[in-house]
Amino acid sequence: AGWDSIIPYTDVGMDEIQALVQDTIFSRSPSALKRTGIFIGGRDSHLAMDMIEEAKKHMVPPFEVPVFADPSGAFTTAAGMVAITEKALKDKFSEDFSGKKVVILGGTGPVGVASAVISAKAGNEVLLVGRSLEKAENIAKICNEKYGSKSVIGAEDAEKANFLIDADVVFNTGAAGIQL
């Protein structure tokens, strides 16, 4: 990928973001920053997004670097699923990935959340299905309020057969080995 070195920091808390970002940006010239980036991993997608926002607040132009996250590979997995679906809709049906009813099974985990946000921002109505209606509704609320989605609704797994009847797209984002 063209990188020379990587410096891992583990168990980083929100209170450490400012110091890490400023140590990164102020230890290089603005031209050297072109070869520097900050990657946020971990397992908590909401914390990763909060860390991105916190990191951005502590950059001082022209001392800025890209900040990106992929906790547990959830963001790249979701983006890949959506991209493949978008291509299939275009190639096989001459349709766009917008204005669709998207059902996301196992949707309360990080891949489901990322898929829901991407799908909603593409102009789709999204039904986020989980084992617990309360949890699914809470996650849908987070998608809509925190990430600017407008059309994510939580739903209960027990009703999934009814949701699948008029679904245009179905994503399975449950954990490996779980039959949905």
Question: Can you annotate each of these PLM segments?
Answer:
Residues 46-47, 178-180:
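Short glycine-rich, flexible loops that bind phosphorylated cofactors or substrates
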Residues 174-176:
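Short glycine-/small-residue-rich Rossmann-like dinucleotide-binding loops
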Residues 24-28, 55-59, 85, 89, ...:
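Hydrophobic, Leu/Ile/Phe/Ala-enriched alpha-helical segments that form helix-helix packing faces
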Residues 69-87:
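A glycine-rich, Thr/Ser-enriched phosphate-binding loop motif common to dinucleotide/cofactor-binding enzymes
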Residues 11-19, 43-50, 76, 80, ...:
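Conserved active-site and cofactor/substrate-binding residues in soluble primary-metabolism enzymes
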Residues 1-63:
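N-terminal ligand-binding/catalytic initiation module
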Residues 37-41, 66-70, 103-105, 125-130:
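Short glycine-rich or small-residue beta-strand-to-loop segments that form or flank ligand, phosphate
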Residues 87-169:
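Glycine-rich phosphate/diphosphate-binding loop of Rossmann-like nucleotide-binding domains
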